Structures are given as C-alpha cells and as structure tokens.
Amino acid sequence: MDIFRKAVSSPDQAGAEAAGLRWLAQADERVVAEVVGVTGTSISTKRVRESRPSVAAARAFGEALCRVHQAGATAFGAPPEGWEGANFIGRVEQPCEPCERWGEFYAEQRIKPFLGGLPEEVSDSAFAAADAIAAVDWDVAPARIHGDLWAGNVLFQEDTAVMIDPAAHGGHPWTDLAMLELFGVPFYDEILRGYGVGQEYHQWVPMHQLHPLSVHALTHGSAYYAPLERAARATLEALR
C-alpha cells in the first residue's frame, strides 16, 4: 500500500482529523481518504491516485457528497464519532459544542471566534451578520459535513473525487458547497448537478462563506477583509 504521511501540529489535530475521516467514510468510503495510522505528530492515509478532473467524476462526487451529508449528525456542532472537543480548520482550533439550532451554532462557533483579532471596521458587519443569522430559526437538519471543503481537499480520480483533511462536524450541507465555490473547484456546476441542489441555494452562498472568510481574514490578513465585508453585507441583505 502506498502511504501518504502528513505532519500535524498537535496530537489533538491528528486525532480530530482521523476521527473526521472515519466518520465521513461511514457514509461513503469511496470518496474519503482511508486512515491507516495516527501518531502524536502525524496522520497517515492511503495515497489517493489522482486523475485529470472530468465532468463525469465531478457529477459522481456531487452525488456521493449528498449521501455523506444525508448520513447526518446528532446535533449542529457535534464532533465526529469517536472524538470529543474542538477540531481544526487548517491549524486553527475551532469549537465543536453540540447545539440544537444551526443559526446559533454557526454564529457563535464558526464566525464570531475568528473576528476578535480583526479591525473593527472589518468585523462590525460580520458581527452584525452573525447576530442576524442566529436570530433565525432555520429549517434544516444537522448534516455530516467535511467542514473545510476547498478545492485543495478534493482529489479527483477517474470516476469520482476523494476528500482529505476534514474539519468534520454536524453542520449545514450548503456550507461545504459554498466553500467549494469560494476557492474554486473544477466542474463546480457539475458537482452541484450531481448533488441535486435547488436554485434557492445560490441566495445563501455568501452566508455560508462567512466562516472560511473569517478564518482567512484572521490567518491571511487584509486580502480577505473586503471579501468578508461583502459577504456580510450580502447576508444582511438576504435576511431582510
């Protein structure tokens, strides 16, 4: 077996990621990297044999991602089975505390924790958007989501794609789709077609991008300030 070994910054990062991969794989092991070993400093997975992205593979991945989401979670913010406590988006720790309401979870655990280190003129609109999101009673069930699904964490194969490096938790399914759009992924429209997402999804893309934009504004700086503000304003407009 050809093994890929990834160094991590802490035992908790390794444990959370491994638990996330195994949890996602329970729903469809064909589209999740297989964990073969975990230490305090690394996580090892079966190496993914990559191929050129294609329409057919993107559509098949969209179908599989929908199945993974539909496997569900016990609550919003619930960590993967076999793990307790925070997980990591990249190397940044984020809370995973089970919550009954998606809006409250998303605002308090996925947006606000990353805004404190930003200039007030940037964070004010994002805080306002978070409060507005939390005030809504969203009609959605907890989905089993990857949580950090940018293009670099989607490795295409001949007939589908494989997910790596998750920040898996119970969340809103559109959060994964919106992150794919934010950072660009080959054949995005075909992924949506395979997934079967409705037109109403597009109105809420900026809201679901507030989490990754908040994280990147904190970790990567001013290049993400304007995109974060635009997403916050679009969210507030959609919620009026």
Regions found by a protein language model. Name each.
Residues P95-A107, V140-R144, A151, L155-P206, ...:
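Active-site Asp-x-Gly
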Residues V205-H216:
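Short helix/strand-capping connector loops at secondary-structure junctions
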Residues M1-E104:
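ATP-binding pocket architecture of kinase catalytic cores
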Residues A73-R144:
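An alpha-helical support segment within catalytic cores of ATP-dependent transferases
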Residues E29, G40, E158-T160, L210:
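Short strand-connecting beta-turns/loops that link adjacent beta-strands
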Residues A19-W23, A60-R67, A128, E190, ...:
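Alpha-helical elements of Rossmann-like donor-binding domains used by nucleotide-donor carbohydrate transfer enzymes
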Residues S10, V38-S42, E50-S51, I111, ...:
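Short, solvent-exposed loop/turn segments at secondary-structure junctions
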Residues S10, H216-R240:
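ATP/Mg2+ or Mg2+-diphosphate-binding catalytic cores
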